[in-house]
From Swiss-Prot:
N-terminal processed form LD78-alpha(4-69) is produced by proteolytic cleavage after secretion from HTLV1-transformed T-cells. Pfam families: IL8 (PF00048). It is found in: Secreted. This is C-C motif chemokine 3. GO terms for biological process: antimicrobial humoral immune response mediated by antimicrobial peptide; astrocyte cell migration; calcium ion transport; calcium-mediated signaling; cell activation; cell chemotaxis; cell-cell signaling; cellular response to interleukin-1. Changing residue 70 to A: Reduces heparin binding. InterPro entries: Chemokine_b/g/d (IPR039809), Chemokine_CC_CS (IPR000827), Chemokine_IL8-like_dom (IPR001811), Interleukin_8-like_sf (IPR036048). GO terms for molecular function: CCR chemokine receptor binding; CCR1 chemokine receptor binding; CCR5 chemokine receptor binding; chemoattractant activity; chemokine activity; identical protein binding; kinase activity; phospholipase activator activity. GO terms for cellular component: cytoplasm; cytosol; extracellular region; extracellular space. PROSITE patterns: SMALL_CYTOKINES_CC (PS00472).
């Protein structure tokens, strides 16, 4: 009986540590979200790269990275945003 109690205690401690470890990994992962979009079209020659926001964000978005290392949120349904994304994909 004592062996099974000790084994159960070890199992519970191991589960608690694994759960703690996986929770801390998820908390350290940054998620970039857009809460508003740029109201102006950015000149295409200013754009160096882009990425899409996470599905965990409340609004979908495309984040353009400028050549001056700034991040600009844009509405993915805008025609110019789709063109820039397409052009960046073709040049990659």
């Amino acid at each position: 009986m004592q062996v099974s109690t000790a084994a159960l205690a070890v199992l519970l401690c191991t589960m608690a540590l694994c759960n703690q470890f996986s929770a801390s990994l998820a908390a350290d992962t940054p998620t970039a979200c857009c809460f508003s979009y740029t109201s102006r079209q950015i000149p295409q020659n200013f754009i160096a790269d882009y990425f899409e926001t996470s599905s965990q964000c409340s609004k979908p978005g495309v984040i353009f990275l400028t050549k001056r290392s700034r991040q600009v949120c844009a509405d993915p349904s805008e025609e110019w945003v789709q063109k820039y994304v397409s052009d960046l994909e073709l040049s990659a």
